């Protein structure tokens, strides 16, 4: 065991924090506590049931994995209490539905637009991840694909000027298609839909994605403390201060709160560390769940919307993930669609009217069942949704993270690491497991690096 580590405090009962506690327990280290500011587990992967009986996630989550440790945790916690799905996703483009990925299925655009995209792809010189995201897109996909889909869609998702973003994060996030593959799809009228790690995915039978983490928290017992908001941290004395005025000591601290908020909570933090944290950018998402008194109809999983006149960038056909996401599990009577609309410091959220804009958008795009009555409109705010990979992000993290580690503070998870490329649930769980092994056994972490 790492010397002098007798107490581990964990901030946040989301995927990373809970996985860390579970691994500490497995390693025989019992002196840990989780402090969660909310009333239940899940964090960004949480779920709620609205007053009308619809279940909603805090975003368009699906459960897939790169890691055996995540698979083992899911099997242990959920067993067979999950559905398995094959992805069926589309891009809503000019009234048509183009199978995802857009750039792999140009034959749905019609001859002229398909030709524009193919010529652009043929002439594209190839992008370097050393440049900005906007330049990388055009150099990789050419003008046609960039103009029609890549730029408008990513502007909607990131709510950030794309020139401010790096291109170092794209490996599992953006499907890169070559000219021969795109041409084959057009000429032979073949769909090319298999790309990506989420081509197949799982989803809990009831309770939404949050059910995974509610069960995991329950299995860990009373050392998971809810409604315990950390408001201050004395890194020298290794002391946490809480909103209720109480204090708790620690020897090692695993924080899954956003790293900018972690730094802001620290006493006597050097100016360079504070400035680096303040330079980090993120987007928020307004999640609007809309339930209808109508069967869900088509079996697609989710759909992307590059059109700037539509507020949301993605819609999830949530009743298709599990019938228990609608009242009484009655998908013969109810449909439910989870929409996501981004905002940021560059594009503030609408002050009012988003619910109406969303329901209008669902009707205009043909998602809403014809002549169906609204059964529920439920809005939630995910203030921290996407950690933006800006061009200055890595430099800022190289300033912050070593300073924290030198003081026994390990900032991990989607917003603790602030690295979107390792920001899925399986990544968060893996980071939690790895940091527990580092603390107890001194082992090197496998996916996180400063």
What are these regions (language model features)?
Residues 51-126:
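Dinucleotide-binding Rossmann-like beta1-alpha1 core, especially the glycine-rich loop
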Residues 16, 40, 260:
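Conserved Rossmann-like nucleotide-cofactor binding loop
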Residues 96, 106, 113-238, 246-252, ...:
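Active-site/ligand-binding neighborhood in enzyme catalytic cores
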Residues 6-34:
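N-terminal Rossmann-like FAD-binding beta1-loop-alpha1 element of flavoenzymes
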Residues 250-252, 259-410, 418-421, 427-430, ...:
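C-terminal segments that line or cap access tunnels to active or ligand-binding sites in enzymes
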Residues 5-6, 60, 250-251:
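Local beta-strand N-terminus motif with an aromatic residue
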Residues 25-49:
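Glycine-rich FAD pyrophosphate-binding loop
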